[in-house]
């Protein structure tokens, strides 16, 4: 079922001749040293180790061995694109075993991933990049990553769970999805985590995401209320683990202001605004719905940091995707806007709940104190920053790029020169030079905000009209023009 979204070779050095005696000595050392060299764990040896230790039972281990063997057999029959995908999935499984990362709770996700890929690449149609599917009757969402095969898409899975919660008539599907997800969770960072088991953007499996885990917190907490089952609160509470532990196990990056929750556990220095914001939304949902003090503390530490970080992600004309990094593409600009709206709404509701009730003619006068036996709630954070930033990001979608040309006082014919301009936000920019109605130069490129320089070499003297047109990612167009005076070419010395 389609779920719908989302060369050089190394240098070969010269080989120098080795004296025979030295070569024989080296070979003998290698022969005698070989038995003592420790071999890396393999899938089969790791499964046997876990079975011998009683950590997995015989039938379970046999099932994993069968899945692995079937995948290896299928790989031998495949060629080209299909072979590349299944080989990559097998390589990830092998690397997980070799790294000593086979633990009982991780294996269900590892081997169901291998099983799904073996079946797909043996017979199913070639997918397109980013395609998402579910394998009925399962509710788990999978995504195709070229070069990594089919992988569990936890963000998509929990996004689907939240969508089922909103429908209100598909509680059975919601329960099935949450139960499936929990069956595939891994023990990590002192709790459970929903791991990604493939290589992505420099990260090696298994890694976790504050964005996906935060979305999972929302789904589990909402499910606990809707389905009237506190086991989902218990699961969400256990899923807080990665927010309390730094990489590589968790996503916590402690700061002077509080805590940043990373989008990728393998990228400690990369702060991504949309993932951080959504992690906070999930923590807030759990803390509020479960009335959980630890969840509330984690949210508060993160919100304090986002309050410091967020202004730097607003360029005044568009959003930045990450720090360090460039501007967001159109999709991520909208995603960040929407996540900020969600945080704005949550904090606005918090303030409304804390507002004093309207005065009643029958109520006794307030003494201004706190009732005995109760604890005064901490004031809700001011939502204005998040509400206002979301609104500015919405306005950005209909605001044309601003351009300013800084033309040189003069150019000279047949000599290299430059024209400088400033652009307010990422856009596709076309620079055109016109002489007497004829286009003599035109270049187009996608450029980010800031100052840019265009090289130009006029062939003739006279006025030259330079036009710059920018179309932003939302389709808004801005333009600027300037006339540049081109002087005659410099005269050559008679001695030349």
Label each residue range with its predicted role.
Residues 39-155, 166-197:
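Low-complexity, Ser/Thr/Pro/Gly-enriched N-terminal "stalk/linker" regions
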Residues 40, 55-65, 72-84, 94-106, ...:
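Structural helix-adjacent loops and short alpha-helical linkers that scaffold large soluble proteins
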Residues 87-97, 108, 151-168, 207-224, ...:
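Well-ordered alpha-helical segments within folded domains of soluble proteins
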Residues 117-150, 171-193, 233-255, 293-318, ...:
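Long, well-ordered core segments of solenoidal/helical folds
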Residues 129-148, 191-209, 253-274, 314-335, ...:
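Carbohydrate-binding/catalytic loop surfaces
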Residues 423-428:
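Short proline/glycine-enriched turn/loop motifs at strand-loop junctions of beta-rich domains
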Residues 439-462:
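Glycine-centered tight-turn motifs at strand-turn-strand junctions
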């Amino acid at each position: 079922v389609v779920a719908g979204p989302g060369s050089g070779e190394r240098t070969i050095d010269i080989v120098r001749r080795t004296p025979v005696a030295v070569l024989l000595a080296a070979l003998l050392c290698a022969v005698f040293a070989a038995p003592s060299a420790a071999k890396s764990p393999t899938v089969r040896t790791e499964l046997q180790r876990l079975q011998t230790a009683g950590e997995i039972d015989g039938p379970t281990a046999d099932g994993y061995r069968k899945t692995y063997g079937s995948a290896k057999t299928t790989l031998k029959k495949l060629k080209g694109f299909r072979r590349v995908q299944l080989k990559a999935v097998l390589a990830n499984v092998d690397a997980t075993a070799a790294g000593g990362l086979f633990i009982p709770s991780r294996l269900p996700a590892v081997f169901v991933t291998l099983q799904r890929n073996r079946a797909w690449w043996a017979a199913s149609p070639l997918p397109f990049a980013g395609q998402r599917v579910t394998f009925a009757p399962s509710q788990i969402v999978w995504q195709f990553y070229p070069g990594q095969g089919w992988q569990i898409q936890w963000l998509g899975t929990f996004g689907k769970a939240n969508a089922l919660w909103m429908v209100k008539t598909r509680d059975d599907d919601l329960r099935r999805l949450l139960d499936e997800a929990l069956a595939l969770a891994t023990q990590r960072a002192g709790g459970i985590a929903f791991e990604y088991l493939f290589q992505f953007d420099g990260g090696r499996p298994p890694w976790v995401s504050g964005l996906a885990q935060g979305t999972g917190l929302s789904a589990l907490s909402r499910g606990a209320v809707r389905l009237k089952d506190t086991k989902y609160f218990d699961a969400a509470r256990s899923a807080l683990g990665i927010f309390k532990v730094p990489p590589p196990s968790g996503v916590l990056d402690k700061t002077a202001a509080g805590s940043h929750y990373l989008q990728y556990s393998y990228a400690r220095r990369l702060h991504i605004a949309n993932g951080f914001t959504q992690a906070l939304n999930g923590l807030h949902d759990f803390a509020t719905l479960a009335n959980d003090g630890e969840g509330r503390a984690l949210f508060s530490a993160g919100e304090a940091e986002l309050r410091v970080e967020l202004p730097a992600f607003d360029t005044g004309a568009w959003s930045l995707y990450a720090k360090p990094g460039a501007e967001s593409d159109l999709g991520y600009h909208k995603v960040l806007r929407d996540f900020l709206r969600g945080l704005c709404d949550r904090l606005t509701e918090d303030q409304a709940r804390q507002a004093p009730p309207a005065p009643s003619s029958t109520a006794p006068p307030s003494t201004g104190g706190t009732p005995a036996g109760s604890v005064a709630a901490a004031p809700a954070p001011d939502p204005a920053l998040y509400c206002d930033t979301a609104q500015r990001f919405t306005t950005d979608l209909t605001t044309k790029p601003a351009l300013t040309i800084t033309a040189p006082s003069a150019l000279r014919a047949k000599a290299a020169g430059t024209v400088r301009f400033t652009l307010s936000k990422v856009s596709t920019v076309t620079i055109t030079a016109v002489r007497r109605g004829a286009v003599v130069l035109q270049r187009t490129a996608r450029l980010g905000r800031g100052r840019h320089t265009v090289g130009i070499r006029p062939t003739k003297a006279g006025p030259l009209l330079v036009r710059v047109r920018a179309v932003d990612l939302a389709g808004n167009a801005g333009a600027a023009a300037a006339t540049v005076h081109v002087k005659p070419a410099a005269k050559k010395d008679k001695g030349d």
